[in-house]
Swiss-Prot record:
The gene is PLAAT4. Optimum pH is 8. Its main location: membrane. Widely expressed. Keywords: Hydrolase, Lipid degradation, Lipid metabolism, Membrane, Transferase, Transmembrane, Transmembrane helix. Gene3D superfamilies: endopeptidase domain like (from Nostoc punctiforme). Its EC number is 2.3.1.-, 3.1.1.32, 3.1.1.4. Residues 1-40 are annotated as: Essential for its ability regulate keratinocyte differentiation. It comes from Homo sapiens. This is Phospholipase A and acyltransferase 4. Exhibits both phospholipase A1/2 and acyltransferase activities. Shows phospholipase A1 (PLA1) and A2 (PLA2), catalyzing the calcium-independent release of fatty acids from the sn-1 or sn-2 position of glycerophospholipids. For most substrates, PLA1 activity is much higher than PLA2 activity. Shows O-acyltransferase activity, catalyzing the transfer of a fatty acyl group from glycerophospholipid to the hydroxyl group of lysophospholipid. PANTHER family: HRAS-LIKE SUPPRESSOR - RELATED, PHOSPHOLIPASE A AND ACYLTRANSFERASE 4. Belongs to the H-rev107 family.
Amino acid sequence: MASPHQEPKPGDLIEIFRLGYEHWALYIGDGYVIHLAPPSEYPGAGSSSVFSVLSNSAEVKRERLEDVVGGCCYRVNNSLDHEYQPRPVEVIISSAKEMVGQKMKYSIVSRNCEHFVTQLRYGKSRCKQVEKAKVEVGVATALGILVVAGCSFAIRRYQKKATA
């Protein structure tokens, strides 16, 4: 299901909303995308492709956007345009097409589908999903430390009162 307000143009990044994560592809025109697909990220994969995080390899594929999206929602998301100058569309598309069929190392943390398409569009590999997760883990860790410290303080205070 497409975003009703913006049709993709060649060179646009497409964010596809899967259950629990987003899959990313590069729109190359005429209804086609190029994307980095681990073995479980098959067209219309939906929630079953969440297991792609366990894979250590992936293939660059050229497929119809509607097939990759399946029943999921998607949108054009060039949100890094405000940070980086996109490469010329011709360079983005030709670079992507040259990679079709290649097998690549895959890592959910450092070499995933979002890293792949941002590298093509901007010449820089970025993944906001991973960056956001790192921040969330950091916040959760900090909160955990505060809770432990607070409990420790309360226990010591209670022990002092009990022995006084």
